[in-house]
């Protein structure tokens, strides 16, 4: 293989790796003198639940390589969908990146960035040599998940899962529903005929994203969308239903009430499709494995898309 062929092969391999959609993280630590350091990475993965381990890789050509490979601690900050600017700060050269951020030092002396979807405060468990990179394996000492939708990365460009998902919604009559979860509870409201429903709103000309914003403003302003959970048609009403899986860090609501998932059998719902969807959600929430339902009011298929790690 010629040198040019080898270069082209590496480029093709990089492009192939780029076909895998990932989130965006900022990996942080502090030098012995307290100076904060960080770099962006999408090569993040959970490794183990017991003990709680995760990994991220760093290129040996990185100016931060020795600082992180020799560090006894580091943190993973998973960026939220509104934090493209934070990712760009760490992607560009700067004398003091952290001066542009709101952050705090953790118990283990790692910078934790404000407003992230989640953070993991780690001690270094192992550093593994891996070709032109090193794999940093961290032992999770503490973590927080805010429930915000994460910032995505695909083929060299950012995307936001919730906003991208709204693009698939057609111009037909659409009912938007928000499946807003908090821990082992789901937000429901009781209708005038004493049946239960999800927070919902008909999509108008201003689009699905605005409909979601209105639902959140009415029911739970701290909620944020993750991805489409169910898409189905009802031929009797000639209407399409879109349900977004959402999360909130707040256990109370402006309207409706949070109901324990174990109490679903005690309730009467507005229709059988909603009841079936909530029963599926209860099972998937327990397993921490989520899928998307495509079909009609009575039958369809579920495709797994998310399996939570650490």
UniProtKB/Swiss-Prot annotation:
Belongs to the non-flavoprotein flavin reductase family. Keywords: Allosteric enzyme, FAD, Flavoprotein, FMN, NAD, Oxidoreductase. Homodimer. The trigonelline monooxygenase is composed of a reductase component TgnA and an oxygenase component TgnB. Involved in the degradation of the pyridine ring of trigonelline (TG; N-methylnicotinate) into succinate and methylamine as carbon and nitrogen sources, respectively. TgnA catalyzes the reduction of flavin (FMN or FAD) by NADH and supplies the reduced flavin to the oxygenase component TgnB. Its EC number is 1.5.1.36. This is Flavin-dependent trigonelline monooxygenase, reductase component. FMN binds at residues 40-43, 57-63, 90-91, 97. The gene is tgnA. It catalyses: a reduced flavin + NAD(+) = an oxidized flavin + NADH + 2 H(+); FADH2 + NAD(+) = FAD + NADH + 2 H(+); FMNH2 + NAD(+) = FMN + NADH + 2 H(+). It comes from the Bacteria. The lineage of its organism: Bacteria, Pseudomonadati, Pseudomonadota, Gammaproteobacteria, Moraxellales. Maximal reductase activity is achieved only upon trigonelline (TG) binding to the reductase component before interaction with NADH. It seems that TgnA undergoes an allosteric transition upon trigonelline (TG) binding accounting for the positive cooperativity toward NADH oxidation. It is an enzyme of class 1 (oxidoreductase). GO terms for molecular function: flavin reductase (NADH) activity; FMN binding; FMN reductase (NADH) activity; riboflavin reductase (NADPH) activity. It holds the Pfam family Flavin_Reduct.
């Amino acid at each position: 293989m010629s040198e040019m062929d080898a270069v082209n092969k590496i480029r093709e391999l990089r492009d192939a790796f780029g076909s895998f959609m990932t989130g965006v993280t900022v990996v942080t630590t502090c030098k012995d003198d307290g100076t904060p350091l960080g770099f962006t990475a999408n090569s993040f993965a959970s490794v183990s639940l017991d003990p709680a381990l995760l990994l991220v890789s760093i290129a040996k050509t990185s100016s931060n390589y020795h600082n992180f490979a020799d560090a006894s601690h580091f943190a993973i900050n998973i960026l939220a969908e509104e934090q493209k600017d934070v990712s760009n700060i760490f992607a560009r050269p700067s004398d003091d990146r952290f001066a542009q951020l709101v952050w705090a030092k953790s118990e283990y002396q790692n910078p934790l960035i404000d407003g992230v979807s989640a953070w993991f405060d780690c001690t270094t468990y192992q550093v593994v040599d891996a070709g032109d990179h090193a794999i940093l394996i961290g032992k999770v000492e503490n973590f927080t998940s805010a429930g915000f939708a994460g910032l995505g990365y695909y083929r060299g460009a950012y995307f936001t899962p919730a906003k991208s998902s709204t693009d698939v919604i057609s111009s037909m009559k659409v009912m938007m529903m928000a499946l807003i979860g908090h821990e082992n509870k789901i937000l429901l409201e009781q209708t005038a005929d004493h049946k239960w429903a999800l927070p919902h709103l008909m999509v108008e000309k201003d689009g699905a994203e605005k409909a979601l914003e209105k639902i959140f403003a009415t029911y739970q302003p701290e909620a944020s969308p993750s991805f489409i959970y169910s898409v189905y048609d009802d031929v009797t009403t000639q209407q399409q239903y879109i349900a977004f899986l959402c999360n909130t860090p707040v256990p109370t609501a402006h309207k409706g009430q949070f109901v324990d998932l174990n109490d679903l059998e005690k309730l009467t719902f507005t229709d059988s499709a909603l009841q079936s969807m909530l029963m599926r959600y209860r099972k998937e929430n327990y397993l921490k494995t989520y899928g998307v339902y495509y079909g009609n009011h009575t039958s369809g298929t579920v495709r797994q898309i998310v399996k939570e790690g650490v």
